[in-house]
Curated annotation (Swiss-Prot):
The keyword Nuclease does not apply. Its cofactor is FAD; (6R)-5,10-methylene-5,6,7,8-tetrahydrofolate. Residues 4-137 form the Photolyase/cryptochrome alpha/beta domain. The gene is cry1. The keyword Oxidoreductase does not apply. This is Cryptochrome DASH. It comes from the Bacteria. InterPro entries: Cry_DASH, Crypto/Photolyase_FAD-like_sf, Crypto/Photolyase_N_sf, Cryptochr/Photolyase_FAD-bd, Cryptochrome/DNA_photolyase_1, DNA_photolyase_N, Rossmann-like_a/b/a_fold. PANTHER family: CRYPTOCHROME (PTHR11455), CRYPTOCHROME DASH (PTHR11455:SF22). Binds 1 FAD per subunit. GO terms for molecular function: DNA binding; DNA photolyase activity; FAD binding. It holds the Pfam family DNA_photolyase.
Length: 461
């Protein structure tokens, strides 16, 4: 009887705990290759984010996660091989060198990864491809509707799924098949740098963070603090580890249930589950709409009335707009790879409404910087704010001055992240959105103010 050789393609399921697909592989094949394809900046992303590299914080967190996964696999007799090749290229190279019988891969939400899987299935039809939903609370058969009939709003989705019983998370696998040898592939070493961030990548760090959170009383007041802008305690901060699959949503839900059994359930503990359901909705939203996630018109046909101004986008990216609260949030993102949920809504509203920019530029830039980037949540939320997604009320615009007064009344957040730059950014010559016109002729700040703020005419003359 010929031996069975498996290929486990890790995507956003970078863990060994609560990984039923890895457990399945351990029981079905005789030898195993564990592969990860390091993400690259695609032409689409380079065009819209105007970036050629990942943010340093994002890259550091990912590398830490990969190193931790490799260590966990080594205790089970396995190794994580990391390649810079695109997924289809990497899998095709391996399949032409090794008689792989089975491929194991998460039921990913991203359309690029799903396209690679479809091509492999078409080109290597004799290979069995096994998929499970490792990034979600529910599997597709558990949904009370066909995926094509996904509810058009989150509220409709929540009402249909929140009472469904969830299976308990699995533990660690006891053993994995030995490594399959005798193949060649371009590989890369993962270099981890000293960590100076509140977020340490990896399954073990993620589990420790979740355990520490539920060992405190913070969950019982989450709903009252969740709109904070800075610090570690105002929200759960589960998202970085959830995004890479270092911790599963089922594991967090089980911890939440244990917390409620000891401390009691209230609106705040329910709201943690509520937020997990938002994430769940956007996972299935991405699965449902695929490439429409990245279209200018979103999931509909109506295009927003926005354009692209290179200077405005640079100001937004660098935190140099006329809006201090936006500047502080963007500088926080650029330095840490993280931004609060409230902050994300404010900077997105600013980009779409105050700056009049195509929402995809903001979504793409977030993808290059966020340590907790999740394809469904990121692009789905940007569509939501731009009025081309799952919000029946259309686009959302926030009063930035009012929001700053509500969530940063003493200006401490702005002062922390902008520092002395605040005075410069608020100076008269920096109030203009544009310093050049449509054909790149310079615009004097005084001329801009006379046109757009005629009430300042006397003081500027």
């Amino acid at each position: 009887m010929s031996k069975k050789i498996g290929l486990y393609w890790f995507t956003n399921d970078l863990r060994v705990n609560d990984n039923p697909l890895l457990e399945q592989a351990s029981q079905q094949v005789d030898r195993l290759i564990c592969l990860y394809c390091y993400p690259s900046i695609t032409p689409f992303l380079a065009r819209y984010a105007q970036q050629t590299q990942w943010g340093e914080a994002k890259k550091r967190f990912l590398n830490q996660t990969l190193a931790d996964l490799d260590h966990s696999l080594s205790t089970l007799g396995q190794k994580l091989w990391v390649t810079p090749l695109l997924p289809y290229q990497a899998l095709r190279h391996l399949l032409t060198q090794v008689e792989i019988t089975d491929i194991y891969v998460d039921a990913v939400a991203g359309s690029d990864e799903r396209q690679a899987i479809a091509r492999i299935h078409q080109d290597f039809s004799s290979v069995h491809i096994h998929q499970q939903a490792l990034h979600s609370l529910l599997s597709e058969p558990q949904l009370p509707f066909a995926l094509e009939a996904l509810p058009s709003t989150f509220t409709q989705f929540r009402k249909q799924v929140e009472t469904i019983s969830l299976s308990a998370p699995m533990g660690y696998p006891h053993v994995l098949p030995p490594i399959e040898q005798g193949w060649q592939l371009p590989l890369m070493d993962i270099v981890t740098e000293p960590n100076h961030s509140a977020f340490v990548g990896g399954e073990q760090a993620g589990l420790t963070h979740c355990q520490n959170y539920f060992s405190s009383l913070l969950p019982s007041r989450y709903k009252e603090t969740r709109n904070g802008l800075d610090g570690m305690d105002y929200s759960t901060k589960f998202s970085p580890w959830l995004a890479l699959g270092a911790v599963s949503p089922k594991t967090i839900y089980a911890m939440l249930q244990r917390y409620e059994a000891v401390h009691g359930a209230n609106d705040s503990t329910y709201w943690i589950f509520f937020e997990l359901l938002w994430r769940e909705y956007f996972y299935w939203y991405a699965r449902r709409y695929g490439a429409k996630l990245f279209r200018f018109s979103g999931i509909g046909e109506k295009k927003p009335l926005t354009s692209f101004y290179a200077q405005r986008f640079l100001q937004w990216k660098h935190g140099e707009t006329p809006f201090p609260i936006v500047n502080a949030c963007m500088r926080q993102l650029n330095q840490t790879g993280y931004m609060s949920n409230r902050g994300r809504q404010l900077v997105a509203s600013c980009l779409v409404h105050e700056l009049g920019l195509d929402w995809r530029y903001g979504a793409a830039y977030f993808e290059t910087q966020l340590v907790d980037y999740d394809v469904g949540s990121n692009w789905g939320n940007w569509q939501y704010l731009a009025g081309v997604g799952a919000d029946p009320r259309g686009s959302r615009q926030f009063n930035l001055e009012k929001q700053a007064h509500t969530y940063d009344p003493k200006g401490e957040f702005v002062a922390k992240w902008c520092g002395t730059a605040c005075d410069k950014l608020n100076a008269l010559e920096n109030l203009a959105l544009d310093s050049v016109d449509m054909v790149d002729w310079p615009i004097a700040a005084s001329a801009y103010l006379l046109i757009h703020h005629p009430q300042n005419k006397e003081s500027s003359s």
